[in-house]
């Protein structure tokens, strides 16, 4: 006989009380999405926004720290002129070599005529923050016409010198290398060397002269009062701690305080109705107790006769240093 199929047992219907007691099927429990508190969503979103803003701010600080030098220094690499264009005798020089024998600095040696009146002096010329040596030929010609020897060079990052981002520390190091080249290679006594700086190079000359009291003197052509303001006045500097990120200062007021050698200040007359002698003195001038001379000059694109007259008058008054001819 064929077997009878078992009759399925009827499933009793669920009462509404089961749902009221929180019962649910396993499938329904597995498919139900978890609930997230709106408060936690708000906190997570806030943390993400703060982290993104912090990353953006830190990135801005990093970019400003890496590129702020371009607001103060404006170097160029192509040297358009040489002293030969002004009829000056000169020798290209290279010094401050690396361990591999590669020179870091390049410049020009412009000797004085053998019978020149001030041939016992050698001027180390520190050019401005803009351009390169090719833009200084007229100034170098004016110095040569005075009858002094001249060494001019490009800082690292300028002209044909080694590539590097300019900075106050590197400028000071470059100037020290140039002094060492004069004393060790050219055998020029320190007491016969005059620093001559223009624009930001004048601020550099004050710092270097303060560290080398054995030099003959220093000439400061239009030193800048607050050069680093070119960085701090940038709109981006208001968003970050620029004073902590920028190390350069070139503070002529503070650097001039320990200056112990004679100084000549050649400053352009201010554009005002007051006489020049009633104008405020340049920053750092009043702090200097050593021999000093201040001359106001009318603005001129090239060194003028008053420039030469003031320079020679100052040279005549320089005291003779031990060991100098």
Residue locations for each model-derived region?
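Short alpha-helix in the alpha/beta-hydrolase fold that links the catalytic acid
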Residues: 139, 252, 261, 274-286
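Glycine-rich nucleophile elbow surrounding the catalytic serine of serine-hydrolase chemistry
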Residues: 197-207
């Amino acid at each position: 006989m064929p077997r009878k199929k078992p009759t399925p047992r009827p499933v009793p219907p669920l009462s509404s009380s089961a749902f009221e007691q929180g019962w649910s099927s396993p499938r329904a429990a597995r498919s139900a999405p978890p609930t997230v508190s709106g408060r936690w969503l708000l906190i997570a979103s806030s943390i993400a926004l703060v982290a993104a803003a912090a990353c953006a701010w830190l990135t801005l600080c990093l970019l400003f720290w890496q590129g702020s030098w371009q607001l103060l220094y404006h170097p160029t690499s192509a040297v358009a002129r040489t002293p030969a264009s002004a009829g000056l005798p000169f020798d290209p020089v290279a010094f401050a070599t690396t361990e591999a024998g590669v020179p870091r600095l390049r410049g020009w040696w412009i000797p004085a005529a053998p019978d020149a009146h001030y041939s016992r002096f050698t001027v180390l010329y520190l050019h401005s923050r803009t351009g390169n040596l090719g833009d200084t030929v007229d100034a170098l010609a004016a110095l040569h016409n005075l009858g002094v020897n001249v060494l001019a060079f490009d800082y690292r990052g300028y002209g044909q010198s080694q590539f590097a981002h300019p900075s106050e520390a590197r400028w000071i190091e470059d100037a020290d290398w140039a002094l060492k080249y004069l004393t060790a290679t050219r055998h020029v006594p320190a007491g016969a060397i005059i620093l001559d700086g223009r624009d930001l190079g004048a601020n550099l000359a004050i710092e270097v002269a303060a560290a080398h009291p054995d030099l003959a003197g220093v000439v400061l052509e239009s030193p800048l009062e607050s050069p680093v303001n070119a960085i701090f006045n940038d709109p981006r500097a208001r968003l970050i701690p620029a004073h902590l990120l920028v190390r350069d200062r070139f503070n002529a007021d503070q650097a001039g305080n320990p200056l112990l050698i004679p100084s000549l200040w050649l400053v352009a007359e201010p554009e005002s109705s007051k006489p020049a002698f009633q104008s405020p003195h340049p920053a750092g001038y009043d702090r200097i107790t050593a021999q000093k001379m201040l001359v106001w000059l009318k603005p001129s694109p090239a060194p003028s006769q008053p420039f030469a007259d003031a320079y020679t008058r100052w040279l005549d008054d320089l005291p003779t240093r031990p060991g100098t001819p």
